From Swiss-Prot:
This is Putative UDP-glucose 4-epimerase. Involved in the metabolism of galactose. Catalyzes the conversion of UDP-galactose (UDP-Gal) to UDP-glucose (UDP-Glc) through a mechanism involving the transient reduction of NAD. It comes from Methanocaldococcus jannaschii (strain ATCC 43067 / DSM 2661 / JAL-1 / JCM 10045 / NBRC 100440) (Methanococcus jannaschii). The keyword Transmembrane does not apply. Pathway: Carbohydrate metabolism; galactose metabolism. GO terms for molecular function: UDP-glucose 4-epimerase activity. SUPFAM superfamilies: NAD(P)-binding Rossmann-fold domains. Keywords: Carbohydrate metabolism, Galactose metabolism, Isomerase, NAD.
């Protein structure tokens, strides 16, 4: 049995689907703060609870759990700056609570979602590999890194094995264009409504956009990775201006973007070195144009606009 925290969320629900496709039994733990009931796979068991609940073991039978895939988190960078206590409560104390349940019930493996976009900070060199210095620019980046360190500590103290996946910018179906969504779903949402999206700064800032299906596949493979920290991205950088052009072309949008002042605390250029993931047998399969086409179709068909 695999426990997926945040399994009703954007990335977590794709992981659940991939596990069930591969005949795993799955329990979803999600408090539906940002998760969505519509994302829940009917073949999974669903528990509506919070990773911070001290009585989690009264709600979930941890004796049946062999692996935890820990996706539940506070993921809003700007929220973390405005409310670092809330961010730390979920991302640090919530993670410790999950680790304590694992220790108590002898669960020997965790796969953890970390952030390649947030833990490294402003890159010293590109592409950014796993040995790049850690220098977060936000409480979110720091809380993700502290989560990593607690997991490594529990490995040293109690022998709990881990795979830590540092995601780049994940996009795909089920990403909510409201709130702290990725730029791709926000741009698509705007252009499908025939509205001009806002680009903060000059639009030359770059990101590494990885498709959610590829990320789900990485989590499945990570069940067999032992005590590894691995970047999960594409190894390619795409500017926000290039992204706008790709989406504009896919949708047939006739307007232009609106440029606004840059946001504080955001990295200017980043993309990840994925050689380690490739050496472990994982590589991204869906390129950006194909991925965007899928998201546009999904948003049209699901009335998310």
């Amino acid at each position: 049995m695999i426990l997926v925290t945040g399994g009703a969320g954007f990335i977590g629900s794709h992981i659940v689907d991939k596990l069930i496709e591969n005949n795993y039994d799955v329990i979803i733990l999600d408090n539906l703060t940002t998760g969505n009931k519509n994302n829940i796979n009917p073949k999974a068991e669903f528990v509506n609870a919070d990773i911070r609940d001290k009585d989690l073991d009264e709600k979930i039978n941890f004796k049946d759990v062999e692996v935890v895939i820990h996706q539940a988190a506070q993921i809003n960078v700007r929220n973390s700056v405005e409310n670092p206590v809330y961010d730390g409560d979920i991302n640090v104390l919530g993670t410790i609570n999950i680790l304590e349940m694992m220790r108590k019930y002898d669960i020997d493996k965790i796969v953890f979602a970390s952030s390649g976009g947030a833990v490294y900070g402003e890159p010293n060199y590109l592409p950014v590999d796993e040995n790049h210095p850690i220098n977060p620019l936000s409480p979110y980046g720091l809380s993700k890194y502290v989560g990593e360190e607690y997991i490594k500590l529990y490995n040293r103290l109690y022998g709990i094995e881990y795979a830590i996946l540092r995601y780049s910018n994940v996009y795909g179906e089920r990403q909510d264009p409201k709130g702290e969504a990725g730029v791709i779903s926000i741009f698509i949402d705007k252009m499908l409504k025939n509205q001009s999206p806002i680009i903060f700064g000059d639009g030359n800032q770059t990101r590494d956009f990885v498709y959610v299906g590829d990320v789900a596949k990485a989590n499945l493979m990570a069940l067999n990775w032992k005590n590894e920290i691995v970047n999960i991205g594409t190894g390619k950088e795409t500017s926000v201006n290039e992204l706008f052009d790709i989406i504009k072309h896919e949708i047939g949008f006739r307007g232009e973007a609106i440029y606004d002042k840059p946001r504080e605390g955001e990295v200017y250029r980043i993309y990840l070195d994925i050689k380690k993931a490739e050496s472990l047998g994982w590589k991204p399969e869906i390129d950006l144009k194909e991925g965007i086409k899928r998201v546009v179709n999904w948003m049209k068909n699901n009335n998310r606009t």
